Regions:
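Hydrophobic, membrane-interfacing alpha helices
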Residues: 1-276
Length: 276
């Protein structure tokens, strides 16, 4: 499969182009949401460089410390990166990890919000639907790279994987679950749910939409990891799956805290009337 083109001797990959389209789509939807909520949409574009830098750093670090099994078999391990530090900067060697991108981007947005006296919770709610949209689009980069595919499958929508991109133990198997497509659809459902809640449930406390994003996205990724062949094992545990379980748990706790526990703690206590 063709995965890019060459300009002046430099290879341009479709993966990078699609990622940028996802970023722009996410920013576009965030500006729409900001305007609808009465916030300044220009802040989105001021925030974007921060989120991009934080997201790329986080995504790269996630890959470095949780390389997939196929790369470990090739000797591309965490220790390899630590002993070849220049390779850490070579994002074409290895790749990026979405969990790290979300964490790094969120941390960068938090720093931006504190620095510019913005509400971090409000802005996470604003960008959450766009984040889901950007992830849905970005997953199509995996299609051109022929990666993030699932277990062997004969279903009508299964995809053909070139021999060069198959895991050694599946070298004779041609068709697989399109895991990237499943996650794309799941992210679009997440975006739809967040847009619906943002319009139909105005009583939700600030930060609640991002909590819903965490729960919905984390749940989908957790179960999709069961289909994934090229996992990232740490001490025999699929670290991506463990992380997503933690994300779901934190999302539930955050949602309950914001909408149930904190309002009760802030509710003024009624004092009994004094007898006369």
């Amino acid at each position: 499969m063709i995965n890019g083109f060459t300009i002046f001797g430099y290879k341009i990959y479709f993966y990078g182009i699609i990622l940028m389209l996802g970023v722009l789509a996410a920013a576009w939807l965030a500006t729409r949401e900001a305007k609808r909520r009465g916030w300044n949409p220009e802040v989105v574009w001021d925030m974007l460089p921060w989120a991009l830098v934080g997201g790329i750093i986080g995504a790269r670090l996630w890959h470095i410390f949780t390389p997939p099994a196929s790369m470990v078999e090739q000797g591309i391990t965490t220790m390899y990166y630590l002993t070849h530090p220049l390779q850490i900067l070579n994002v074409r060697n290895g790749g990026l990890g979405i969990p790290g991108a979300v964490m790094g981007g969120a941390l960068a947005v938090y720093i931006f919000a504190r620095k510019n006296k913005q509400s971090f919770g409000a802005w996470t709610d604003i960008v959450a639907p766009g984040l889901a949209l950007g992830q849905a689009i970005g997953r199509w980069g995996n299609f051109f790279n022929q990666e993030v595919y699932g277990a062997p499958s004969n279903l009508p929508w299964s995809i053909f994987i070139d021999a060069a991109h198959r895991l050694p133990e599946y070298s004779a198997v041609e068709r697989y679950h399109p895991l990237f497509l499943y996650e794309c659809v799941w992210n679009l459902l997440n975006m739809t749910l967040l847009l619906f809640l943002g319009r139909m449930k105005p009583g939700l406390k600030t930060g609640s939409l991002f909590a819903v994003y965490m729960i919905f996205y984390g749940t989908g990724r957790f179960f999709l990891e069961f289909l994934r062949l090229d996992i990232s094992p740490v001490a025999g545990i699929n670290i991506n799956q463990l992380f997503m379980a933690i994300v779901v748990g934190l999302g539930v706790l955050l949602l309950v805290w914001l909408n149930v526990i904190r309002p009760r703690l802030q509710k003024p206590q009624e004092t009994p009337a004094s007898a006369e």
